[in-house]
Regions:
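Glycine- and acidic-residue-biased ligand/ion/polar-headgroup-sensing regions
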Residues: 48-64
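Ligand-binding loop in jelly-roll beta-barrel domains
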Residues: 80-104
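Structural motif
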Residues: 58-60, 67, 83, 93
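A short, N-terminal "cap"/entry segment at the start of jelly-roll beta-barrel domains
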Residues: 1-29, 62, 110-113
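A cytosolic small-molecule/anion-sensing beta-strand core signal
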Residues: 55-56, 71-72, 90
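Short acidic-glycine-tyrosine-enriched beta hairpin
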Residues: 64-81
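Residue-level marker of beta-strand positions
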Residues: 40, 75-77, 93
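Conserved short histidine dyad/triad with adjacent acidic residue
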Residues: 15, 29-46
Length: 113
């Protein structure tokens, strides 16, 4: 068993320094994202099904024509390749779970040398 206290993990650079909590090929990837007040994750998509959990604060999420204001405890789910954006006025802490990891067509890159 592994466990994490999501409120105690430091994310000093906000969205520029997400913290990968767990990543296992064929399974899932869990990432903690801290957003500072006014930060935004612009329109993007991922190859995996994604679940986004608001751990602290509040965010506004747009996906296509839908817009949701999501507060503490809200869980949002996105299909693979579904475009979406996330923004916060007051700051937020989010848990992102991607599964299966990596998704079909996910860019693998090459190892650093």
């Amino acid at each position: 068993m592994q466990s994490w206290n999501l409120m105690e993990i430091d994310t000093p650079e906000g969205s520029r320094s997400p913290v990968v909590l767990h990543s296992e090929d064929g399974e899932a990837r869990a990432v903690l994202i801290g957003l500072k007040p006014g930060q935004r994750l612009g329109d993007h998509q991922v190859k995996e099904a994604a679940m986004l959990v608001v751990v602290d604060g509040a965010v506004d999420v747009e996906a296509g024509a839908e817009r949701v204001s999501a507060g503490l405890g809200t869980v949002l789910r996105f299909d693979p390749d579904e475009r979406h954006s996330v923004s916060t006025e007051s700051g937020a802490r989010l848990l992102l779970v991607l599964a299966p990891w990596p998704g079909a067509g996910h860019y693998r890159g090459s190892a650093a040398r």
